[in-house]
From Swiss-Prot:
It comes from Methylobacillus flagellatus (strain ATCC 51484 / DSM 6875 / VKM B-1610 / KT). It catalyses: an N-acyl-L-alpha-aminoacyl-tRNA + H2O = an N-acyl-L-amino acid + a tRNA + H(+). The record marks N12 as: Discriminates between blocked and unblocked aminoacyl-tRNA. The gene is pth. Belongs to the PTH family. This is Peptidyl-tRNA hydrolase. InterPro entries: Pept_tRNA_hydro (IPR001328), Pept_tRNA_hydro_CS (IPR018171), Pept_tRNA_hydro_sf (IPR036416). TRNA binds at Y17, F67, N69, N115. The active site is at H22. Gene3D superfamilies: Peptidyl-tRNA hydrolase.
Length: 192
């Protein structure tokens, strides 16, 4: 099997961060759990909430509880334990460079200043993992980024982000089967 075996949603733990833009990856995993009747539970050895994707015994879900900037510790722990190579990992995260409502799938590349991605690459020893980038928009000023990602999106932005998450759920079968080109074509055509 060459499809995704580990879906990771990035975010920060705690009620004060629950509704912030930086938690878009957590929202995505929560939606995936709701749609597939899957569950995650706290697993200390994986530094996060983890569980199997319902109906797919070899596919895991993970929400690191290490805080965003140390997400790699959780990802590497689970990936090494279950012998999941980087190319079978999909990390779902907020993306400043995309507007709300956009979702883009890509493999590898830089971290674009996203410290969660930076730590995952460092802990795995490679950038060669898949990313699902959920657009949250940009505040327009670089100095406002930290405050922006740690605040909740406006109602219309949240609606657009929800649409992008819905669209990305439609390519789940392709992701599980390793049909990444097909998934990208379908997703990138759907969310413009």
């Amino acid at each position: 099997m060459n499809g995704i075996r580990l879906f990771v949603g990035l975010g920060n733990p705690g009620a004060q961060y629950e509704d912030t833009r930086h938690n878009a990856g957590f929202w995505w995993i929560d939606q995936l759990c709701a749609q597939t009747a899957s569950k995650t539970t706290l697993e200390a050895k994986f530094f996060g909430l983890s569980g199997r994707l319902n109906g797919h015994a070899d596919t895991w879900l993970l929400k690191p509880t290490t805080f965003m900037n140390a997400s790699g510790r959780a990802v590497a722990a689970l990936a090494r334990f279950y012998k999941i190579p980087a190319e079978q990992i999909l990390v779902v995260h907020d993306e400043l460079d995309l507007p709300p409502g956009a979702a883009r799938l890509k493999k590898g590349g830089g971290h674009s200043g996203h410290n969660g991605l930076k730590d995952i690459a460092a802990q795995l020893g490679t950038n060669d993992f898949w990313r699902l980038r959920l657009g949250i928009g940009h505040p327009g000023d670089r100095s406002a980024v930290v405050n922006y990602v740690l605040n909740a999106p406006l109602r219309d932005e949240m609606q657009q982000i929800a649409y992008a998450m819905d669209d990305s759920m439609l390519v789940l079968p392709q992701l599980l089967e390793g049909k990444f080109e097909e998934a990208m074509l379908k997703l990138h055509t759907k969310t413009k």
